[in-house]
């Protein structure tokens, strides 16, 4: 039996994780980054950009459900949704399950990610690219929100880590543009790394977002693929009541949506905003 090739993630300098490669499906440099999609016996198909794992078939549902359904069900009546990034299609799939949403705009800087994820990760998008409500824009997210005259009810930043093409999606310019692009009562959420190992991301996002939103916080989910396990998501709005919604109302919104999830529940939603003391202390000390 031949030894399998090993792929090593390069996100952290002093520790990390590896994946055995059963078959490489695609590996090329796009116009913006190095893209590889390969098969792994335990996790299914894996996609990485510039040496950092972005998604796996095995547990992508956790990430996409939590970054979609928490803001949309908190809002309760979102008609227009903007996705920044999201080229693998998973976020689009989950947003499109909300039948009350009338327009979905996705802004992805790298057309290659969209093209090859549609080909090699079809279960992520699950046909949602053909949804008539969907509009794809190939552009830099900062540039889009800076120039956009449209308004949205929910903005989801499905960004990579703050290196390479994703770095601009952690800047004050981007957050200011998102705040300006939200309707009254709108909600902004964003991927914010594994806080235990990438605490500076949360601290930086909190400081910057607080300049443009009245209510800024974080929520979390356990996602095995991301080294360190507990992924943190930024939350920003101008109405604290949206974040503090009671369980009865959330259950009503969830039941009315008709959506069935594998990870998200209204109870998980409520619990996800209970943050560990080390994060609360770090945010307080940084003020």
From Swiss-Prot:
A Pfam entry, by short name: Spermine_synth
Ranges of residues in domain PABS: 5-238
Cell compartments where the protein resides: Cytoplasm
Active site: 158
UniProt pathway annotation: Amine and polyamine biosynthesis; spermidine biosynthesis; spermidine from putrescine: step 1/1
Enzyme Commission designation: 2.5.1.16
Catalysed reaction, written as an equation: S-adenosyl 3-(methylsulfanyl)propylamine + putrescine = S-methyl-5'-thioadenosine + spermidine + H(+)
GO cellular component, one term: cytosol
Residues involved in spermidine binding: 64, 88, 158-161
MF GO annotations: spermidine synthase activity
Keyword terms, alphabetized: Cytoplasm, Polyamine biosynthesis, Spermidine biosynthesis, Transferase
One Gene Ontology biological process: spermidine biosynthetic process
Top enzyme category: transferase
Chain residues that bind S-methyl-5'-thioadenosine: 33, 108, 140-141, 165
Keyword Transferase assigned: yes
Function of the molecule: Catalyzes the irreversible transfer of a propylamine group from the amino donor S-adenosylmethioninamine (decarboxy-AdoMet) to putrescine (1,4-diaminobutane) to yield spermidine.
Family: Belongs to the spermidine/spermine synthase family.
Assembly and binders: Homodimer or homotetramer.
The name this protein goes by in its record: Polyamine aminopropyltransferase
